[in-house]
A protein has these predicted regions:
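Extended two-metal-dependent nuclease catalytic cores across DNA- and RNA-processing enzymes
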Residues: 1-150
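Low-complexity, acidic/Ser/Thr- and charged residue-rich accessory regions of DNA metabolism proteins
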Residues: 129, 139-189
Length: 189
C-alpha cells in the first residue's frame, strides 16, 4: 500500500482510522511509540519486545504507561520530550516525567505554549527558548489520518501469489532461499 506524496506512517494512520470507524479490529505491528497516538477502540499496537515476544497495547495501556489522558497526547509527549529515534528535538532538558506533568497540567502543547506565563524559573526559560523546536516536534510527531486513500477490504484479502510474478521478483532480488521455500524450486525464471 502506498500513496504518492505521503509517508507510510500517514497511510497506515489513515487506514487504521478508517478501520476503526468501520468497527474493524486492527493491529499495527511496530516498536515506534509515535504509533500510540493512533490507538483507538478498535486499533491496537502489536509491539515487539526486546528479547522476543510481543505486547498488545490498547488505550488503557497507553494511559497507564505514560500517565496521560488519551492516546492522542502521545503527540504532545513527543513534542516536549523529543524522540532521538525519529529525530524530534523536543524541549532540551524536558524528559518523560516532566513532559507528562506539563501535559497533565495544561492538557496539550498548544495550551502550554499559550500559557507560558504560568511557568516559573528554569522551566519557563526552557519552554520559551525551545518554542519553535516544540512546534516542529509536534508537527513531526503527528501521524496524519486524512490521506486520500480508501480502505479496500477486498484488495486486502490474502490470496495465493501469482507464481510467475513472484518468481521474477525473487530472481531480481536474488532471494534464492525464498524462491525455494515459496515456489518449491531454486531455478531462475
Amino acid at each position: 500500500l502506498q500513496k504518492d506524496g505521503f509517508e507510510a506512517d500517514d497511510v497506515i494512520g489513515t487506514l487504521a482510522h478508517q478501520a476503526d470507524e468501520m468497527g474493524i479490529l486492527t493491529y499495527m505491528l511496530t516498536p515506534d511509540k509515535d504509533y500510540g497516538q493512533l490507538i483507538a477502540d478498535n486499533v491496537k499496537m502489536y509491539k515487539p519486545r526486546h528479547g522476543g515476544g510481543y505486547d498488545i497495547i490498547g488505550k488503557e495501556e497507553v494511559q497507564q504507561k505514560y500517565g496521560i489522558a488519551t492516546p492522542a497526547q502521545i503527540i504532545d509527549l513527543l513534542a516536549l520530550m523529543g524522540d532521538s529515534a525519529d529525530n524530534f528535538p523536543g524541549c532540551p532538558g524536558v524528559g518523560e516525567k516532566t513532559a507528562v506533568k506539563l501535559i497533565n497540567q495544561f492538557g496539550s502543547v498548544a495550551n502550554l505554549l499559550e500559557s507560558t506565563d504560568q511557568l516559573k524559573g528554569k522551566m519557563k526559560e526552557k519552554v520559551m527558548n525551545a518554542t519553535e523546536d516544540i512546534k516542529l516536534s509536534y508537527f513531526l510527531a503527528t501521524i496524519r489520518q486524512d490521506v486520500p486513500i480508501s480502505l479496500d477490504l477486498e484488495a486486502m484479502k490474502c490470496k495465493e501469489p501469482d507464481a510467475e510474478t513472484l518468481a521474477k521478483l525473487f530472481d531480481e532480488l536474488e532471494f534464492k532461499t525464498l524462491t525455494n521455500k515459496f515456489l518449491g524450486k531454486a531455478e531462475k525464471t
